[in-house]
Amino acid sequence: MSEKMIKVTQVRSVIGGTKKQKDTIKALGLGRPNHKVEIKDNACTRGQIRVVQHLVKVEEL
């Protein structure tokens, strides 16, 4: 059984953000606006997304 996946798109820049927000964006595999990644949907990932929810858009696949 395959795990659920989500597509995360960075919609805003991290300029002016805190170090925690910048590190979280990098950990998610993002780095610039309009960059997209597909990652596994689990509690760890959801926690990271919550930290930068104002910078990203999340879509269920």
From Swiss-Prot:
A GO molecular-function annotation: structural constituent of ribosome
Keyword entries, A-Z: Ribonucleoprotein, Ribosomal protein
Keyword Transit peptide: no
GO cellular component, one term: cytosolic large ribosomal subunit
GO terms classed as biological process: translation
Family: Belongs to the universal ribosomal protein uL30 family.
HAMAP family on file: Ribosomal_uL30_B (MF_01371_B)
Quaternary state and interactors: Part of the 50S ribosomal subunit.
PANTHER family: LARGE RIBOSOMAL SUBUNIT PROTEIN UL30M, MITOCHONDRIAL RIBOSOMAL PROTEIN L30
UniProt xrefs under NCBIfam families: rpmD_bact
Name assigned to this protein: Large ribosomal subunit protein uL30
Organism, scientific name: Chlorobaculum tepidum (strain ATCC 49652 / DSM 12025 / NBRC 103806 / TLS)
